[in-house]
Swiss-Prot record:
Localization of this protein: Mitochondrion inner membrane
Membrane topology: Peripheral membrane protein
Family: Belongs to the peptidase M16 family. UQCRC2/QCR2 subfamily.
Protein task: Component of the ubiquinol-cytochrome c oxidoreductase, a multisubunit transmembrane complex that is part of the mitochondrial electron transport chain which drives oxidative phosphorylation.
GO MF entry, a single one: metalloendopeptidase activity
Protein keywords: Acetylation, Electron transport, Membrane, Mitochondrion, Mitochondrion inner membrane, Respiratory chain, Transit peptide, Transport
Official protein name in the record: Cytochrome b-c1 complex subunit 2, mitochondrial
Family matches, as Gene3D superfamilies: Metalloenzyme, LuxS/M16 peptidase-like (3.30.830.10)
Amino acid sequence: MKLLTRAGSLSRFYSLKVAPKVKATEAPAGVPPHPQDLEFTRLPNGLVIASLENYAPASRIGLFIKAGSRYENSNNLGTSHLLRLASSLTTKGASSFKITRGIEAVGGKLSVTSTRENMAYTVECLRDDVDILMEFLLNVTTAPEFRRWEVAALQPQLRIDKAVALQNPQAHVIENLHAAAYRNALANSLYCPDYRIGKVTPVELHDYVQNHFTSARMALIGLGVSHPVLKQVAEQFLNIRGGLGLSGAKAKYHGGEIREQNGDSLVHAALVAESAAIGSAEANAFSVLQHVLGAGPHVKRGSNATSSLYQAVAKGVHQPFDVSAFNASYSDSGLFGFYTISQAASAGDVIKAAYNQVKTIAQGNLSNPDVQAAKNKLKAGYLMSVESSEGFLDEVGSQALAAGSYTPPSTVLQQIDAVADADVINAAKKFVSGRKSMAASGNLGHTPFIDEL
């Protein structure tokens, strides 16, 4: 397959005529292609490039950016949510119609996802069409126009998107949990506050992109593409904004409680304490503890009846319930605890029994076989999460932004094996002794407050 490249200025790029053909070299005739090793490059401007040529018929490229909701402030809340919906708006190089029609014409897909830490712009298509979608990806992320009338027309979608997401009580409780646990940064919701819907302006969108979509805050990850070509694209078109951008405030854990009385017969509740930042040895210990307690059913639509949390609660509660450990790690903090779903009348018994089970482990009642079984579950879950191209792309991109490097699965498994039984017990102790945060919704007449635990 012939590699075609064309140089051009930034102004010419906006005409969508100069991006290099992002195509991989074919294997020699008659020789079955073998996937190559992951190639990793960090440019002087801080931009990270990683690629894996797996010779798959479809390619996937993701641009990961440190621009999640934690980087919003009190004056621009909801900006990242609107950006998430604005990927098809007119840019300096293509109209909204051209972007939508161009992607559709080759059977491709452009998606935007975001967490509290990062935003990810991902394109998927047949490998022969990567150059087409790559140009749209670059336009959307480096040359948005945010025309006033297009932004205004998109505002009602914020309310719909939020309403659909928060139909799930678990999503609502998790959002409230972060708001209760933190005073800033990680307290910011993934969804635009109601009072800001209709008020996010094109100027705010431009400022957010200008301050956060910088080279040092980006990672370009490709699967099914050639590393030299991906590197050339990054050097030529993602070097527009230099510098580190706005660093953002460090998350301040404080603890607190948000209760939402709505009369639902099922009570959803989450109780957590601060844990550890992602990538640390302590975070690995909390991950093992999560699987010691029970991270959820391993059979589709199955029960969680074999977990220690479930068994502990079942001894004293005879109404239907569900309970699992909760674990979330971020770049500078983390949350660990458990999540319960129960009948309103038994909510207090379920929460207290689950809390007492963690206290039991904190007192040293933990066997080595239980720890080994938890490690095996954690390792299996991790390996299965990176088995798909989507999961692998997300893992490489997240690591590239967090650490500027990539830790292969073999090393991750060694880090999990290095967790000692005492480390897991200490993690449980940290939860028990730590300042708690709680969020609950439903008929809360029998749901205890934090100080009642």
